[in-house]
Amino acid sequence: MVNGNLARQEHIELPEIPLVKDDPLKWCSVSLKDIFARGKRLDASSFDVEAKQARSLLKEGKYPLVSLSGTDGLIKDAFYPGRFKRIYCDNNHGVPFYLPSQMTEIYPRAEKHISKLTNCDIDELKLKLKTLLLTRSGTIGTIAYVSQTTEGMVFSDDVIRITFKQEYDLGYVYAFLKSKIGNLLLKTNGYGSVITHLEPEHLSNMRIPNAPAILKQRINDLVVRSYALRDESNELIDEATRLLIEALKLPPLEELKTSTAPVETFSVKISRSDRRFDASYHVPIVNKIIEQLQSQAAEVTTIGDPRISKEVILPGRFKRVYVEEGHGRVLIGGKQINELDPATKKYISVAKYSKKILESLEIHTNTTLITRSGTIGKVAIAPRHWEHWIPSDHIIRVVPASKKIAGYLYIFLASDYGHELITRYTYGSVVDEIDDNHVRNICVPFLKDAAVQANINELALAANQKRYEAYKLEQEALQIMNDDVIHAR
């Protein structure tokens, strides 16, 4: 078990962000018509009681209900591109292709590329500004807003694109569908049955409160500003990464991937084997990156250097006792660390954990997080609203030595070059893994120009702060939606 330290015991006063609460929905009345429609079933499991209660709540609300889609609805157009067979290819010869699971990421990075020979309309797949995105299969009901960051990105046909007649309805409907009530209704039909596949036609059957234009505008403005701050944070990250690459004179990765053989072959000296005999550890690109760092940096050290980190924590497996929101700590997994506010986050009780165990589990602002199993090498920096959240044991925590290095460390590890240095340590035949010892040995350069390094650090921290502010604005929009629209009487 990892011992605690004074830095990790520091308590930061956070502005209070109201918890968006909904009334407990445990019962409802069912009409005889609904019973016959459900095959004369009388068991409660045939009806989503909470969804039916939510519909009753809206009917009794302050504002009249309006259909999302249809002649008198709020939606101008809702569609998804036609299905097509995907022809995947390498990065140099394809178009970056994004999956629905990346829709809610703050800064999506393409994991796949599709060939330009693919029989589809690429322009139709590209996202347009002022569009609401909605997943239609798999995990349905995930909501996203197309901002400058995602404009022009090619997403799959599993994403419904929605535009609105009135501009302010975009942010308003976004906030409603993000709320507990709205998302619950989106995933169920009129009888309360869970929908496994969502089509644009389903939106015509969904009715939401039609609040006054001034209230809609207020909510929309908060959502728009929240996404604008995310865009600004991404621009700062891009600028910091550019400065890093320029300072170290790092060439594009493709230039480092040279091969003169028809298959990937290379020789390794025994003295440099590090007792690793798996080829992935010795790929030449890693050595070329390290050689470039050594030639251009003032010094190349490792994450384990006390000037870089205070601790590298790989928590042991821990028992999870799940509780309701408001009664425990937020638990997030590796798939969620690139999201601002994970929609599928869970809550666990910490009542049974000792202080030492809890300190090894919870994270603090500006901690760098690295996924260690499955998809290895996803990197995030903890924003302020993640203070005391608990990532799963599949995420390694790197506690920075100080605020002066926290942002710089994140920028380097999140770069393409940092990713190569992380994934070189991958081991495992079925499930890929790395551990905390591997992370401690990852190379990190100190720049020759300390001012440039400090600038990179400040840009990263400023970006992280903007993401916290974006989170607060979205929570404010959800709070207004909850208090002044859904529960208004």
Set out the residue ranges of the language-model regions.
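Non-catalytic DNA-recognition/assembly elements of restriction-modification systems
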Residues: 1-84, 212-318, 450-489
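Sequence-specific dsDNA recognition surfaces
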Residues: 65-86, 101-129, 304-319, 335-365
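Short, surface-exposed loop/turn microsegments at beta-strand edges and helix-strand junctions
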Residues: 87-95, 104-107, 111-113, 125-127, ...
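Short hydrophobic-aromatic micro-motifs
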Residues: 96-99, 132-135, 330-333, 369-371
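Well-ordered mid-protein domain cores that form the structural environment of catalytic cofactors
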Residues: 103, 121, 133-143, 174-188, ...
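A short beta-sheet element
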Residues: 135-175, 333, 360, 371-412
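A short glycine-rich beta-alpha junction/loop motif
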Residues: 153-160, 192-214, 389-396, 427-452
